[in-house]
UniProtKB/Swiss-Prot annotation:
It catalyses: Hydrolysis of alpha-(2->3)-, alpha-(2->6)-, alpha-(2->8)- glycosidic linkages of terminal sialic acid residues in oligosaccharides, glycoproteins, glycolipids, colominic acid and synthetic substrates. The keyword Cell wall biogenesis/degradation does not apply. Inhibited by the neuraminidase inhibitors zanamivir (Relenza) and oseltamivir (Tamiflu). These drugs interfere with the release of progeny virus from infected cells and are effective against all influenza strains. Resistance to neuraminidase inhibitors is quite rare. Residues 91-469 are annotated as: Head of neuraminidase. Its cofactor is Ca(2+). Pfam families: Neur (PF00064). The gene is NA. Its EC number is 3.2.1.18. HAMAP family: INFV_NRAM. Residues 36-88 are annotated as: Hypervariable stalk region. It comes from Influenza A virus (strain A/Hong Kong/1/1968 H3N2). This is Neuraminidase.
Length: 469
């Protein structure tokens, strides 16, 4: 082969290779463009399928980057559609309660910057549970903690942390409040925050981080709310609020809120005489609350809320083993399901119970006179039979030698049923412990279980002599 033929042969081979490479690049480009614009259509409905009219909120939109021969292909991951909660699953059948969480706030305050709080509660969104409390605008090892036994000051704020995380200096202050309630409707958090003058307080309704609505005091006598979670069903949230005497007739109203906006207000009706600090839970299609009668009864009021027509009914827990403190001893206590028992009704403490068919699960202080100790049990017929007193499955949560305080319920949706959980406020400091000038709390949390369980006691556990004065 002469030199000219060699040159022609090499040129032909080079041209062929270049042509093949060019065609491969075109193929890669076409593939890239096709994949990019197709965007994995996430099971798009057929063109003739009717689409829902309600808005769809995209929780997150993740882009996954795949590298192929130095060519970048973007693949869209199907977004998760967030829906309102409806709580339509049945209630879990339980044998008792198992330990879930304890924040040890007071013990940690002996050597760290932890907020002074009271009125704690727990509420969950679809993924996590959070603890809330009303802060006093100060940490414990701080002179501002002196005399924090007072309930209503303008520096109190609603604190929010993931459950089990004590309220440290980095804790978020959700709103200004000396009375509050919070709940998640499936899309965002609603916070009801009350602050201001005793005779002219304001309730702010904060939804998804924005102030949406407000309402002023209607009886000019300490507007107040639940101090535990509200409940939302299909986008409508309900919260119980009271304004008026703490030891006489008061004006209780049930508010209905949609995305932070008040859409209806219903007055309390039924036989309950005095209603405060309700502990509410979803009982699809409605909401049920167990409350505090601070006037006439040591048996607890029941408020039933119809979420469809906004109607309200009220009565009292039937169990003759009553739930409030102070109360008569169990041999002489009574309840007829409809009326306050007029047994040591003045004063009281926030508490909880929930129905289980004809029976009732409940918690209360072990002491009938003081906020000391804490126990739970089931009363056979306690939801349907007047003055029923047959108690089973008793558990000690806090032994009688240690202090307790408020308690309340919260609900957690599982794969097949809705579980009931409760928290107990463990108060420390004044009035009882006069070595120190502050009043604060930690919490312990239990949840319903269908399994077996042991025994124990879970008090606050701080040595008051180790604490800042």
């Amino acid at each position: 082969m002469n030199p000219n033929q060699k040159i022609i042969t090499i040129g032909s081979v080079s041209l062929t290779i270049a042509t093949v490479c060019f065609l491969m690049q075109i193929a890669i480009l076409v593939t890239t463009v096709t994949l990019h614009f197709k965007q994995y259509e996430c099971d798009s409905p057929a063109s003739n399928q009717v689409m829902p009219c309600e808005p769809i909120i995209i929780e997150r939109n993740i882009t996954e980057i795949v590298y192929l021969n130095n060519t970048t292909i973007e693949k869209e991951i199907c977004p998760k559609v967030v829906e309102y909660r409806n709580w339509s699953k049945p209630q879990c059948q339980i044998t008792g309660f198992a330990p879930f969480s304890k924040d040890n706030s007071i013990r940690l305050s002996a050597g760290g910057d932890i907020w002074v709080t009271r009125e704690p509660y727990v509420s969950c969104d679809h993924g996590k549970c959070y603890q809330f409390a009303l802060g006093q605008g100060t940490t414990l090892d701080n002179k501002h903690s002196n005399d924090t036994i007072h309930d209503r000051i303008p520096h109190r704020t609603l604190l929010m942390n993931e459950l089990g995380v004590p309220f440290h200096l980095g804790t978020r202050q959700v709103c200004i409040a000396w009375s509050s309630s919070s709940c998640h409707d499936g899309k965002a958090w609603l916070h009801v925050c009350i602050t201001g003058d005793d005779k002219n307080a304001t309730a702010s309704f904060i939804y998804d981080g924005r102030l949406v609505d407000s309402i002023g005091s209607w009886s000019q006598n300490i507007l107040r709310t639940q101090e535990s979670e509200c409940v939302c069903i299909n986008g409508t949230c309900t919260v119980v609020m009271t304004d008026g005497s703490a030891s006489g007739r008061a004006d209780t109203r049930i508010l209905f809120i949609e995305e932070g906006k008040i859409v209806h207000i219903s007055p309390l009706s039924g036989s309950a005489q005095h209603v405060e600090e309700c502990s509410c839970y979803p009982r699809y299609p409605g909401v049920r609350c167990i409350c505090r009668d601070n006037w006439k009864g040591s048996n607890r009021p029941v408020v039933d809320i119809n979420m469809e027509d906004y109607s309200i009914d009220s009565s009292y827990v039937c169990s003759g083993l009553v739930g409030d403190t102070p109360r008569n001893d169990d041999r002489s206590s009574n309840s007829n399901c409809r009326n306050p028992n007029n047994e040591r009704g003045n004063q009281g403490v926030k508490g909880w119970a929930f129905d289980n068919g004809d029976d009732v699960w409940m918690g209360r202080t072990i002491s009938k006179d003081l906020r000391s100790g804490y126990e739970t049990f089931k009363v056979i017929g306690g939801w349907s039979t007047p003055n029923s007193k047959s108690q089973i499955n008793r558990q000690v949560i806090v032994d009688s030698d240690n202090r307790s305080g408020y308690s309340g319920i919260f609900s957690v949706e599982g794969k097949s049923c809705i579980n009931r959980c409760f928290y107990v406020e463990l108060i420390r400091g004044r009035k009882q412990e006069t070595r120190v000038w502050w009043t604060s709390n930690s919490i312990v949390v239990f949840c319903g279980t269908s399994g077996t369980y042991g025994t124990g006691s879970w008090p606050d556990g701080a040595n008051i002599n180790f604490m800042p004065i």
